[in-house]
From Swiss-Prot:
One of its GO terms (cellular component) is host cell plasma membrane. It holds the Pfam family Flu_M2. It is found in: Virion membrane; Host apical cell membrane. This is Matrix protein 2. Homotetramer; composed of two disulfide-linked dimers held together by non-covalent interactions. May interact with matrix protein 1. GO terms for molecular function: monoatomic ion channel activity; proton transmembrane transporter activity. The gene is M. Residues 44-97 are intravirion. Residues 71-80 have a biased composition (Basic and acidic residues). It comes from Influenza A virus (strain A/China:Nanchang/11/1996 H1N1). Residues 1-22 are virion surface. The chain crosses the membrane at residues 23-43.
Amino acid sequence: MSLLTEVETPIRNEWGCRCNDSSDPLVVAASIIGIVHLILWIIDRLFSKSIYRIFKHGLKRGPSTEGVPESMREEYREEQQNAVDADDGHFVSIELE
């Protein structure tokens, strides 16, 4: 008994494939899974950077400010800007002797 399910045999002067189990539900399911896997792999290769960025950071661009008074929003913006401004003056000077 052979473990092969497909046998290549000469049919009418051509090489063909005699697949008797092609209507088996397991073969159909495996074919569908293979096709879906191939499609998902292609999509992943084409759009990997944008897909992983969405998973990492979500669809939001920043912290939610819903329900926060405008004065607190402005204070938060000033704190963020001051933190950026403070970092601008910190440079390390290294001298080699």
